[in-house]
Amino acid sequence: MQHKLLINGELVSGEGEKQPVYNPATGDVLLEIAEASAEQVDAAVRAADAAFAEWGQTTPKARAECLLKLADVIEENGQVFAELESRNCGKPLHSAFNDEIPAIVDVFRFFAGAARCLNGLAAGEYLEGHTSMIRRDPLGVVASIAPWNYPLMMAAWKLAPALAAGNCVVLKPSEITPLTALKLAELAKDIFPAGVINVLFGRGKTVGDPLTGHPKVRMVSLTGSIATGEHIISHTAPSIKRTHMELGGKAPVIVFDDADIEAVVEGVRTFGYYNAGQDCTAACRIYAQKGIYDTLVEKLGAAVATLKSGAPDDDSTELGPLSSLAHLERVSKAVEEAKATGHIKVITGGEKRKGNGYYYAPTLLAGALQDDAIVQKEVFGPVVSVTLFDNEEQVVNWANDSQYGLASSVWTKDVGRAHRVSARLQYGCTWVNTHFMLVSEMPHGGQKLSGYGKDMSLYGLEDYTVVRHVMVKH
């Protein structure tokens, strides 16, 4: 397995402390990787800064060609990437290969095209004898911090728009799941000029802090927890860096009496538990109107009970393990606290799976109340709660009564209600009669403590640029 860092176009061993990388399906150590030293972090940033002098001036066509080559290489090595992701994250191999790899390839291809469509505005004469123009230029060095739930996909979401806009990147994947990012570094080094892409390994304190706080880093992009986002915003404040934050969610799933219950059950069974629920848009906070509450709980409980967790290389496996032992304990604690309320009922699941690996049973909890922690706090595991509501006004207020604002869905056959409710929801995305669907052309991002900035789409590309005014006297 490729375990070296990419700094200034060269694969080099880390000079810092070694950290174990685990297989969450077994709990075994896959390998140990040495972290980047402080000197290597500095070298990576300075290499990116030096490379920016030329990369930032390349044509969109030239940048697009590099991105397309990288997309092709990822596609050609799709099985290798899927196997690494499966071993390091515990994802079902078939899901990694069939779902994630094509989406990752598409992100690079989309931004290759988008790079050639990014324009400033040719304005007019707002002052006599002077012509004004608006430019969208790259910022410089971007420090990108990727999470452990979708390591390669989140690396793609960060690398593609930043590079397409003409920036240079220093990427730090999670120390829990670094293997696909390190493999990507190996394949990218011969496609991009030295220093344009740099990939480091290490923990937040030892590598993340010196990276994000480096004076030559002009922007920090994070997908992670609220706590990590708060830390980075505070840490980077003295140098006034631009920050781009995607900090998780607790998606409300609003099911009205007239909804297609079978579609809801099928949707939540899939979209509430995909990736073992380790998804910031997971359909995890159901609000069911009183007329269909009992029916939905009964049918959804039966459906969730059929979900199969097992070995990642088994084609019949639907849920793999959680990503780490520490996270397994967090999920278990959240469910135990829900049980202890006395009014929340475990419909199915609610316990760790016996044996090796970090497995937690697919869990459905009914009878949850609006103020319960299981409703208000992100669990980030295969755990879905159901809360009864009376009317539209109540459920909109409850759905918005959350520190999160990333994703939501509304299930109803009433078109007017669908438009009315979706317009009032304080979330970056609202799906109607579906959930979880993402495409490269549409923006993904939140509000409130879910963060700000957009991934994917032309809006995502613009986030990695600075708007400049040029005035010419004539």
Curated annotation (Swiss-Prot):
Pfam family, one: Aldedh
A GO term, aspect molecular function: NAD binding
Pathway assignment: Amine and polyamine degradation; putrescine degradation; 4-aminobutanoate from 4-aminobutanal: step 1/1; Amino-acid degradation
Keyword Oxidoreductase listed: yes
Catalytic center residues: E246, C280
Bilayer-crossing regions: none
UniProt EC number: 1.2.1.19, 1.2.1.-
Coiled-coil ranges (or none): none
Function in brief: Catalyzes the oxidation 4-aminobutanal (gamma-aminobutyraldehyde) to 4-aminobutanoate (gamma-aminobutyrate or GABA). This is the second step in one of two pathways for putrescine degradation, where putrescine is converted into 4-aminobutanoate via 4-aminobutanal. Also functions as a 5-aminopentanal dehydrogenase in a a L-lysine degradation pathway to succinate that proceeds via cadaverine, glutarate and L-2-hydroxyglutarate.
Family: Belongs to the aldehyde dehydrogenase family. Gamma-aminobutyraldehyde dehydrogenase subfamily.
Assembly description: Homotetramer.
Other known facts: 4-aminobutanal can spontaneously cyclize to 1-pyrroline, and 5-aminopentanal to 1-piperideine.
Matching PANTHER family: ALDEHYDE DEHYDROGENASE-RELATED
Name the record gives this protein: Gamma-aminobutyraldehyde dehydrogenase
Native species: Escherichia coli (strain SMS-3-5 / SECEC)
